C-alpha cells in the first residue's frame, strides 16, 4: 500500500510538472505574439483570455477528441459505451469548432486594432516547494520552510 501511495505521489508530481510546462508554453506563445505586433492601444477593449490560453485549450480538446474517437472503435467496449463516446465526440468537435472560431476572430480583431490582450503570468504555486504546503515542511510554529 505504501509503495502504491508513493507511486501515486510521483505521478501527481509528474503531472504537475507537465502542467507547468504547458502553462509556460502558453505564456511563451502570448509573449511571442505580442512581440510580433506593434504596441497595442491600451484604450482598446481588453480580451481576458489570451491566444496562448485558447491554443492550450484547443490542444487539450485535441487529446480528448483523439481518445474519445478511439473509444468509439474499441471492439472490447460495449455498444452503449461506443455510442456514448460517439455522442461525446460530436460535442467535443462542436466545442473545438467554436473555440477555433473564437481564436480566429480574436486574432483578426487584434490585428485590426479592435481588441487587445495582455500577457498574464500564471504564477502557479503547485511546483514551488516554498509555496506548496505539500512540498514544504511546516515547523512547530507553522512557518513554512523552503
What are these regions (language model features)?
Residues 1-146:
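Anionic, Ser/Thr-rich low-complexity intrinsically disordered regions
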Amino acid at each position: 500500500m505504501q509503495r502504491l501511495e508513493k507511486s501515486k505521489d510521483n505521478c501527481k508530481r509528474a503531472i504537475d510538472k507537465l502542467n507547468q510546462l504547458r502553462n509556460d508554453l502558453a505564456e511563451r506563445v502570448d509573449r511571442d505574439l505580442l512581440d510580433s505586433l506593434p504596441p497595442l492601444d491600451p484604450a482598446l477593449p481588453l480580451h481576458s483570455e489570451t491566444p496562448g490560453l485558447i491554443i492550450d485549450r484547443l490542444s487539450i480538446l485535441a487529446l480528448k477528441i483523439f481518445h474519445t474517437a478511439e473509444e468509439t472503435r474499441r471492439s472490447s467496449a460495449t455498444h452503449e459505451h461506443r455510442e456514448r463516446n460517439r455522442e461525446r465526440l460530436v460535442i467535443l468537435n462542436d466545442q473545438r469548432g467554436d473555440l477555433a472560431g473564437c481564436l480566429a476572430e480574436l486574432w483578426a480583431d487584434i490585428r485590426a486594432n479592435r481588441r487587445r490582450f495582455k500577457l498574464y503570468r500564471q504564477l502557479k504555486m503547485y511546483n514551488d516547494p516554498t509555496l506548496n504546503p505539500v512540498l514544504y515542511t511546516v515547523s512547530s510554529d507553522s512557518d513554512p520552510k523552503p
